[in-house]
């Protein structure tokens, strides 16, 4: 009898709402967690050029505590410190990230800062000599995170992040599985709020990775093969349509492809 390949598969649970008015489920999700002090993290463009922050505030009502609206590209360390300080001062018990890669990974580190209450430098992965990197065990509870995507990104369902230093030094890397999102939103209006150029650039990254993964499909187990094949199919069909500012379906499909890529790992 021919030997049967052995493999293991582990996945984290996440709730997901997609489509028209998907964001309307935000209040129900916050209520499910009994969250009373929701704090939003987003960038200046989302806060000033889209109605998303006002929409989230209206949906949450009294559960809305405040927002940090100055998160910059690549999640600078100083911005994350400021966001964590504001969230702590407002007693945040739920973090809502509105944006794409930079904001999503920054919010994870905000959660780490709130939970551990130590200098971020002490919580980062350490590299020494030629040995393997060592990630500190971050055991304290973390506030739950909701991710509201404005563009497709594989950062949507991760537990790690890297922050940029203001002095240009090595990035600070963090990992805590408790910072994986509880809920993800692919709301059509939120996704259409991003300019087509951003949708295309992020989508191209998702497609390129899907293409590379599909080329190595024979080495993968059956579950990974399925994820890779469908991620490639979704991204290949969505990519040519991302430039349409009125068509949300390819943006949703690209988000799905990016999520499947996470499950591939």
What are the language-model segments listed below?
Residues 116-223:
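A glycine/threonine-rich phosphate-anchoring loop and its flanking beta-alpha core
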Residues 15, 37-39, 66, 93-96, ...:
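Structural motif
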Residues 92-110, 150-156:
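Glycine/serine-rich anion-binding loops at beta->alpha junctions
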Residues 213-265:
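Active-site segments that bind and position negatively charged phosphate/pyrophosphate groups
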Residues 52-56, 83-84, 103-116, 158-161:
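Short Gly/Thr/Asp-enriched flexible loops that form oxyanion-binding sites at enzyme active sites
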